[in-house]
């Protein structure tokens, strides 16, 4: 049943830069992506993405309003 779920409002975005990793075990990538469709076409956002990602990948965003906070400096 979950495989049949389709997001009508999803917008494609292309990964143009990988800023780093976050999360307790580094499983989340922070990326900059360029919106390819919808009302925000051409806008560049910073988003957190779970799972493997590389430059040029297309990701589907349910909404394009939110941006991720910048990664902070790591304490030693």
From Swiss-Prot:
The gene is rps28e. Belongs to the eukaryotic ribosomal protein eS28 family. InterPro entries: NA-bd_OB-fold, Ribosomal_eS28, Ribosomal_eS28_CS. PANTHER family: 40S RIBOSOMAL PROTEIN S28, SMALL RIBOSOMAL SUBUNIT PROTEIN ES28. One of its GO terms (cellular component) is cytosolic small ribosomal subunit. This is Small ribosomal subunit protein eS28. The keyword Ribonucleoprotein applies. Disulfide bonds: none annotated. It holds the Pfam family Ribosomal_S28e. One of its GO terms (molecular function) is structural constituent of ribosome. One of its GO terms (biological process) is translation. PROSITE patterns: RIBOSOMAL_S28E. Keywords: Ribonucleoprotein, Ribosomal protein.
